[in-house]
Amino acid sequence: MMGALCALAVTQAGLILAAPALRAYWPFSWYYHVVFRTVLQDTQRHRWKYWATPAFYAGVYAYCVWLFYGEVYAEIAKALWVPERWVLPAAVVAPAAAGVAAAATPAAVPADAAYDGLLFHDGVECRTCRVRKPARSRHCGVCGRCVPLADHHCVWLNNCVGRGNYGLFYLALGAHCALLTYGAVRLPLAAPAGRWPRALLALELLVASFAVLCVWFTATQVALVRDGMTTNEQDKWYAVQESMREGTLVRLRGRFYHRVEGGDGVEFYSTNAYDHRTYALHNEPYAVVTSHEEIPNVYDTGSFCENLRQRLDPQARIFRRRVRGL
């Protein structure tokens, strides 16, 4: 029965994901118009869909807890140390409690970061909120607000991670990593010699799979803090690096522009996506940016601890050094 349900779920997911490319053919056309466009693409309709992933993970988590205490614990209890038996209930509750707190706490603490003139520009108004966009912020169509010091919209929490809930997010992430890694390592060591009951094997596969995912994601977050950037800013830096590789990013008197070659010659545009004006730089001594060393990340303090403090401490001063001498 469980295998049939899994096969059905995988089939439906495949039909939905393939629908955009094969929408000219039935049944993909039905999945595209009825499911993909109305449920997935439209951010305002069927908002219950955003709770599907948290509900799925909550169900898996609850199933693992039931499997452990209902089927597995009796098999491995003798192999557990006494302190483990005392700590396990708290260790099981902590990730769930931290996750609920992170999901319920909005990222709404204002930030006063400086505009670097490359990724973020002053004078830009959010087209949805109709307010001035702070530097390092991002508008989330799912949450319906601009998020200060925005990192990403976490589908597992159905909440944006940003200034105001970084601490709870990191706490939930750390608690999950600790519990899942412990379980993935400890279950095989505590398994009865010479046999693996079906429940124990199922629990080990689930715990180990989620442990790998959780540890990988934690490592990416640690790397972002080290580099003084967010997931949102990392995506912007990828676009900047692509412009450098193509030789289209130029600078003049501390400002950055894109050089675009077309049928009418070369035109220059601001790196501000909201500024659609063309700039006359043909006779100006502009320089082509060819190395990331020419455009340092002004939001990176150079200290992992200070970068982390900017996220965790609502009173921390956001790094305000500006690019000079460009």
Curated annotation (Swiss-Prot):
Belongs to the DHHC palmitoyltransferase family. SWF1 subfamily. It catalyses: L-cysteinyl-[protein] + hexadecanoyl-CoA = S-hexadecanoyl-L-cysteinyl-[protein] + CoA. It is found in: Endoplasmic reticulum membrane. Residues 23-49, 107-164, 220-326 are cytoplasmic. Residues 1, 71-85, 186-198 are lumenal. Keywords: Acyltransferase, Endoplasmic reticulum, Lipoprotein, Membrane, Palmitate, Transferase, Transmembrane, Transmembrane helix. One of its GO terms (cellular component) is endoplasmic reticulum membrane. Residues 124-174 form the DHHC domain. Disulfide bonds: none annotated. Its main location: endoplasmic reticulum. The chain crosses the membrane at residues 2-22, 50-70, 86-106, 165-185, 199-219. Pfam families: DHHC. It is a multi-pass membrane protein. Its EC number is 2.3.1.225. Palmitoyltransferase that targets several endosomal SNAREs. Palmitoylates the SNAREs at cysteine residues close to the cytoplasmic end of their transmembrane domain. May have a role in the cellular quality control of transmembrane domain-containing proteins. The DHHC domain is required for palmitoyltransferase activity. This is Palmitoyltransferase SWF1. GO terms for biological process: cortical actin cytoskeleton organization; establishment of cell polarity; protein targeting to membrane; regulation of exocytosis; vacuole fusion, non-autophagic. GO terms for molecular function: protein-cysteine S-palmitoyltransferase activity. InterPro entries: Palmitoyltrfase_DHHC (IPR001594), PFA4/ZDH16/20/ERF2-like (IPR039859).
